Regions:
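Transcription-machinery-associated regions
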Residues: 1-95
């Protein structure tokens, strides 16, 4: 089960990275999204698990206010949930 989730997360990150300007047409939004995705890319070596520290980490990568980061994170979470439902139901990542 953990391997499946790790596989899904890798595919999710790849999908969002490849389509970042389609999902987030504004340059600043795309940069914020990429910094969030970077945390997913580094998840195996990250030692930060609380929300406050994650937000701080993102703000260090991109100069953005918390509400803007939350807005981008919410959009990514929505995509994650939609794609994960399909992945669980059909066993593959739908692009």
């Amino acid at each position: 089960k953990n391997d499946q989730l790790a596989d899904f997360v890798d595919q999710f990150v790849d999908y969002c990275t490849e389509n970042i300007y389609m999902i987030f047409p504004k340059e600043k939004d795309a940069r914020i999204a990429d910094s969030i995705l970077e945390l997913f890319r580094r998840r195996d070596i990250l030692e930060i698990f609380n929300k406050k520290a994650l937000y701080f980490n993102i703000r260090e990568m991109v100069d953005a206010k918390t509400p803007k980061i939350t807005s981008i994170a919410t959009r990514l979470a929505r995509i994650f949930q939609e794609k994960y439902l399909i992945y669980q139901e059909h066993g593959y990542f739908e692009h």
